[in-house]
Each structure stands twice: as C-alpha cells, then as structure tokens.
Amino acid sequence: MAPSQKALLVLVLSMLLTASDSRARRIDCTRFVYAPICRGVAAKRGGDSLSVGASTELDDALTDPFLRSEEPREEDTEKKWRELSRLSRVLQILLSHPTGETEQLDRLLTL
C-alpha cells in the first residue's frame, strides 16, 4: 500500500469515528429546550421524563367534592318525583278529553 493510500485510509477512518461519536452524544434537553431532538414526540418517547409525578392526595382533594356533588340528594329526587307525577296527571287528562279545550290545558299547566 502506498503512503498516500494509508493517509487517505486513516483520514476516512478518523472522519467516520468522529461522525459516529458526535451522533452518539445526547443533547441535554434541560439546557437546549429548542433543539430539534428535544421537541415533539421524539423527545417525549425517549429517555428521562421531566414531568412531575402524580400526586394522589392532591387529585383526591380536587375530585372528591366534584364527585360528591354528582350524587343525587333526597330533595332533588322528591322534586323530580313530584314533577313526574304532575306530568303523568296532565297527560292522562289530555288523553282522556277531546282536543280543543285550551282553557283546561292552561289550568292544568298552572297547577
């Protein structure tokens, strides 16, 4: 092998080693947040997560009052029951009498 070929081979090998070494280094995303590797889905999938861990005590403190407010209260169910029975009476009267009696309908709706 000629000395120029050896020099060319060493140059190519050194370029390959430096290129592979520079690609292997990871960018510190805490310092370089706008680097392309630190943005988007690729950053979320790889490596360490910067998110805060789940706090179950805080979650419970926030969701418990909301869930309790969704439970039906006794006065709400009584009110709904009264409204349904009233609607049932109005429908029974309307179906049993011929149509065209607007005065009776107005009276029933104001009960």
UniProtKB/Swiss-Prot annotation:
Recorded domain comment: The cysteine framework is C-C.
Disulfide bridge partners, by residue number: 29-38
Propeptide regions on this chain: 44-111
GO CC annotations, alphabetized: extracellular region
**Compartments (UniProt record):** Secreted
The record's comment on protein family reads:
Belongs to the elevenin family.
> Function of this protein?
May mimic the function of prey elevenin neuropeptide. In vivo, intracranial injection in mice induces hyperactivity.
Q: Tell me yes or no: is Secreted among this UniProt entry's keywords.
A: yes
The further comment given in this record reads:
Negative results: has no effect on six different human nAChR subtypes including alpha-1-beta-1-epsilon-delta-epsilon/CHRNA1-CHRNB1-CHRND-CHRNE, alpha-3-beta-2/CHRNA3-CHRNB2, alpha-3-beta-4/CHRNA3-CHRNB4, alpha-4-beta-2/CHRNA4-CHRNB2, alpha-7/CHRNA7 and alpha-9-alpha-10/CHRNA9-CHRNA10, when tested at 1 uM.
What protein name applies here?
Elevenin
Which residues, by range, are in coiled-coil regions? none
**Tissue expression pattern:** Expressed by the venom duct.
Molecular function GO labels: toxin activity
What binding partners and quaternary form does the record give?
Monomer.
Task: Give the signal peptide range.
Answer: 1-24
Answer whether the UniProt record assigns the keyword Secreted to this protein.
yes
This protein's UniProt keywords: Cleavage on pair of basic residues, Disulfide bond, Neurotoxin, Secreted, Signal, Toxin
